[in-house]
């Protein structure tokens, strides 16, 4: 089983990110589960969502404490939470940022992981460029597919289009493809 924890803030599409990830996995014939963890928080408050992917039925229902991958949609959370808590040795880290890991103050931890398992991509900028809104979730889904190899881009494309129709879907797919290509090139 591959387990993903997504950290962000309310309004960034954290819950939708896990839903689209699980849809993409399902479209590839896998079993998947997506669920959020939040209370009555408002826009801007920290939110966590989870996704499990496996080739067999998933019976677990609890939050993911030991993820194989973490996606950080908002790097300001580094000061508020230990977003890396429980990350599996050799796990994957995808961060929405154009800043260096040194500037973010996380390079020492990330140096303990395989270099090809760690990447930052300016997903918010890609979302603004392609969708016109600062919601990085679809772009980060493209980056996730590239860094982990767990999903094919065609499944990511289909999952995004299932969630968002028309021009919004097209823009989100374009942002996801740009992130996918940026992560592959990194």
Residue positions per predicted region:
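Active-site cofactor/cluster-binding pocket
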Residues: 1-186
């Amino acid at each position: 089983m591959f387990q993903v924890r997504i950290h962000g803030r309310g309004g960034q599409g954290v819950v939708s990110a896990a839903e689209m990830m699980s849809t993409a996995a399902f479209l590839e014939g896998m079993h998947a589960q997506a669920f959020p963890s939040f209370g009555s928080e408002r826009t801007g408050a920290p939110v966590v969502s989870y996704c499990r992917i496996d080739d067999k039925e998933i019976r677990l229902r609890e939050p993911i404490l030991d993820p194989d991958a973490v996606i950080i949609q908002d790097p300001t959370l580094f000061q508020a939470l230990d977003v890396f808590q429980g990350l599996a040795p050799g796990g994957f880290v995808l961060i929405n940022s154009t800043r260096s890991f040194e500037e973010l103050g996380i390079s020492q931890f990330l140096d303990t992981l395989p270099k090809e398992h760690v990447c930052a991509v300016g997903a918010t900028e890609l979302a603004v460029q392609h969708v016109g809104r600062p919601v990085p979730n679809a772009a980060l889904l493209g980056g996730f597919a590239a860094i982990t190899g767990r999903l094919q881009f065609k499944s990511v494309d289909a999952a995004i289009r299932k969630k968002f129709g028309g021009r919004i879907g097209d823009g989100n797919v374009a942002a996801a493809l740009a992130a996918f290509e940026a992560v592959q090139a990194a």
